[in-house]
Regions:
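N-terminal low-structure segments adjacent to metalloprotease catalytic domains
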Residues: 1-146
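Hydrophobic helix-coil surface modules that form long, contiguous segments used
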Residues: 141-144, 149-164
Length: 164
């Protein structure tokens, strides 16, 4: 998998699942174009994140990142278009989710985190191959979606449509 570098003085190595730089402690995440992991600075006044190379653009952590720490996606707030009255702020990858596990069961969260990591890697690879990536909201007939559900008999793993 491709690695990335922080823009801090140490040019710290960043990995695909990195959520902070171990050298400078800045928040890092997958950018909104879904092609690189890079650092973000937080602006207390606006309550938003920004990139040093693009300071005018405002970013926010994906809700699944901010609330459950299951992804490291960042969302460009200037490009955000609410879908069907849904006020969730979701990154590129999380917009492909149709079903997530029952999050009232705390044991599901680390399992969902593993599934999300695998999904992001798969989407990243498909994008790198220049394959079309459209979710069900964008293309109801042919769009790609992910349903992460629990197995009815065993509570220690998830089942996706790909398992069938």
């Amino acid at each position: 998998m491709k690695t990335f570098r922080c823009s801090c003085d140490n040019k710290q190595l960043l990995f695909f699942e990195s959520s902070s730089c171990v050298s400078c402690q800045r928040v890092v995440g997958l950018d909104d174009a879904f092609d690189k992991v890079e650092p973000y600075d937080f602006d207390e006044e606006s309550g938003c994140y920004f990139k040093a190379r693009r300071p005018a653009a405002r970013y926010q952590k994906c809700d699944n990142n901010a609330n459950y720490n299951v992804c490291n996606g960042m969302v460009n707030l200037d490009d955000l278009v609410p879908e069907d009255g849904n006020d969730e702020v979701l990154c590129f990858a999380c917009r492909f989710n149709e079903t997530v596990p029952d999050l009232s069961i705390v044991e599901h969260i680390p399992l969902w985190q593993k599934m999300e990591a695998a999904k992001r890697r798969a989407l990243y690879t498909l994008k790198a191959l220049s394959l079309p990536l459209r979710n069900l909201r964008q293309d109801p007939e042919n769009g790609l979606s992910f349903d992460f559900t629990t197995d009815r008999d065993v509570n220690d793993h998830f089942v996706s449509k790909l398992d069938y």
